[in-house]
Amino acid sequence: MLALFIHTTGVLSKLLSEAVEAIEPGPVEGIRATGANKLEEILYGVLPQVMPLLISYSLYRFESNVRSATVVGMVGAGGIGVTLWEAIRGFQFQQTCALMVLIIVTVSLLDFLSQRLRKHFI
């Protein structure tokens, strides 16, 4: 799980830096022209342009990490992946089916909630 966290942090940092570099300079210059300090330039000029992308990227990476956690768990990192792997290895088909349904419902619910959050914030 630490590996997923480190990888996600790196990816989100890179995407955020790319988003900040691609902002429109007009709003920042307008805020600077009013005599705002650097913090106010960031709060009112940069963040409003970057937040929709940051929210979207963060939700995507969260969804991706939930899916990846199952696979990583199957190879020994723990969690529901280990339980699923043990059920598969033990030919416990009812438990395997129940776990698969649980995983599918969880991922589908997260996708639905993520979609709703994107519509609300973006």
Swiss-Prot record:
Keyword Methyltransferase found: no
Gene3D superfamilies named among the record's database cross-references: MetI-like
Organism this protein belongs to: Escherichia coli (strain K12)
Subunit structure: If the reading frame is restored, the complex is composed of two ATP-binding proteins (PhnC), two transmembrane proteins (PhnE) and a solute-binding protein (PhnD).
PANTHER family assigned: ABC TRANSPORT SYSTEM PERMEASE PROTEIN P69, PHOSPHONATES TRANSPORT SYSTEM PERMEASE PROTEIN
Biological function: C-terminal fragment of the PhnE protein, part of a phosphonate usage operon that is cryptic in K12 strains. Growth of K12 strains on phosphonate can be observed when it is used as the sole phosphorus source after a 60 hour lag period, suggesting the operon is activated. An intact PhnE in strain B is (AC A0A140NFA3). Part of the binding-protein-dependent transport system for phosphonates; probably responsible for the translocation of the substrate across the membrane.
Pfam families found in the cross-reference section: BPD_transp_1
Descriptive protein name: Putative cryptic phosphonate transport system permease protein PhnE2
Places the protein is found: Cell inner membrane
Record key words, sorted: Cell inner membrane, Cell membrane, Membrane, Phosphonate transport, Transmembrane, Transmembrane helix, Transport
Coiled-coil region(s): none
CC per GO annotation: plasma membrane
Keyword Isomerase part of the UniProt annotation: no
Family: Belongs to the binding-protein-dependent transport system permease family.
Residue ranges of domain ABC transmembrane type-1 in the record: 1-114
Protein topology in the membrane: Multi-pass membrane protein
Regions that span the bilayer: 3-23, 39-59, 68-88, 93-113
An annotated GO BP: organic phosphonate transport
